């Protein structure tokens, strides 16, 4: 879609956002009915187009979605890059009979060769662009450093293309223009492509082989690029080269947990117990969001005990590997997430401190994982 001005584009985005907010505010029972209708419509349209469909299964959101689709009487394959998930999630995947696809690269190889997934996909993408200059991305790099856009961006200034100053000071030196302005650069790579190699591409290859398009358990309330795409394209989308269904697009995490209870879903142990807050919000006492143990998207938004502290509680050996020795510098010196977190100012040492008092864990709730506008912290790419 082409826009004649930045103002027209902003009006369009605001309208799409307001439409999503309106759907998010409807009662839970109505949301479930809307989801069921989206599922039926997507399957009907797939049949009309000669397409198969499947559920891309990962964490709780997609586990609940797969169960809902089954309860509606549809026999839809469940496909998962299950090896990336927590062991307790893998148990549920096996119970569900998921078809397992293998990652194209190992987690270690991705961190070493591509870079660390940190802050957010959008920010990591910009940092990666600065680190890999070409004549083609020259204008984009200038916008990331200065906020000044070229003709395609209607020559806007102070645009959202610019890295936040906090991270511009730390990563802007990867680009010659940023280095000239005195910005620093890290001694490690940053990348947004981890999900591509670990699950997106493997699942896409399976889908192509089986002429199938996915159901995804994505929600706009997760924020970031997911919210942008869902607000723009809605629940069911059939494009020139892409088709997908996100029946939970207008859900909040509480709605998913509520539906999990109503459907009697086997909730993986990593999520803890289900509880209901005083205002009727459903949440789990353990992890609110799950994914790869090496993922750092959204870490800057978390309070301690953050995800790496909780990893220490579950597996001190795995924590030690990812934090101190999963990668090597050019001189052979081992390093890991600890060095990355030090660089961006995130505390991570002495994780055992947070588990000396078991009451700390019991006090955690979904509200420790919300941003100021009430949306869940963006952590996956998935």
Language-model segments: which ranges?
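ATP-dependent adenylation/nucleotidyltransferase module used to activate substrates
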Residues: 2-256, 260, 380-382
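ATP/NTP-dependent adenylation/nucleotidyl-transfer catalytic domains that generate, transfer
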Residues: 2-21, 51, 241, 253-382
């Amino acid at each position: 879609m082409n826009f004649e001005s930045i103002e027209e584009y902003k009006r369009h985005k605001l309208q799409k956002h307001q439409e999503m907010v309106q759907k998010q505010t409807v009662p839970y029972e109505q949301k479930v009915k809307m989801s069921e209708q989206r599922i039926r419509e997507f399957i009907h349209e797939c049949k009309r187009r000669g397409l198969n469909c499947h559920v891309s299964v990962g964490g709780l959101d997609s586990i609940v979605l797969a169960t809902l689709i089954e309860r509606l009487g549809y026999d839809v394959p469940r496909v998962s890059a299950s090896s990336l998930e927590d062991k307790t999630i893998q148990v549920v995947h096996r119970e569900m009979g998921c078809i397992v696809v293998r990652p194209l690269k190992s987690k270690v190889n991705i961190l070493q060769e591509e870079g660390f997934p940190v802050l957010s996909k959008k920010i990591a993408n910009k940092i990666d662009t600065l680190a890999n200059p070409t004549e083609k991305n020259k204008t984009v790099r200038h916008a990331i450093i200065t906020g000044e856009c070229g003709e395609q961006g209607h020559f806007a200034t102070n645009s959202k293309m610019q890295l936040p100053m906090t991270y511009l000071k730390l990563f802007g030196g990867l680009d010659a223009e940023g280095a000239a302005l005195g910005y620093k650069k890290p001694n490690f790579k940053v990348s947004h492509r981890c999900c591509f190699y670990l699950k997106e591409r493997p699942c896409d290859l399976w889908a192509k082989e089986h002429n199938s398009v996915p159901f995804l358990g994505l929600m706009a309330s997760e924020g970031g690029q997911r919210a942008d795409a869902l607000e723009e394209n809605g629940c069911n989308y059939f494009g020139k080269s892409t088709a997908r269904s996100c029946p939970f697009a207008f859900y909040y995490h509480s709605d998913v947990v509520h539906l999990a209870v109503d459907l009697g879903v086997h909730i993986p142990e990593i999520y803890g117990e289900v509880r209901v807050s005083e205002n009727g919000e459903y949440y789990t006492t353990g992890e609110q969001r799950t994914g790869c143990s090496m993922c750092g998207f959204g870490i800057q938004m978390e309070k301690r005990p953050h995800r790496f502290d909780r990893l220490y509680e579950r597996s001190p050996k795995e924590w030690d590997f990812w934090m101190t020795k999963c990668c090597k510098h050019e001189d052979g010196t081992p390093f890991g997430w600890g060095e990355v977190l030090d660089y961006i100012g995130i505390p991570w040492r002495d994780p055992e401190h947070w588990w000396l008092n078991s009451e700390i864990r019991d006090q955690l709730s979904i509200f420790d994982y919300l941003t100021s506008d009430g949306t869940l912290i963006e952590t996956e790419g998935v």
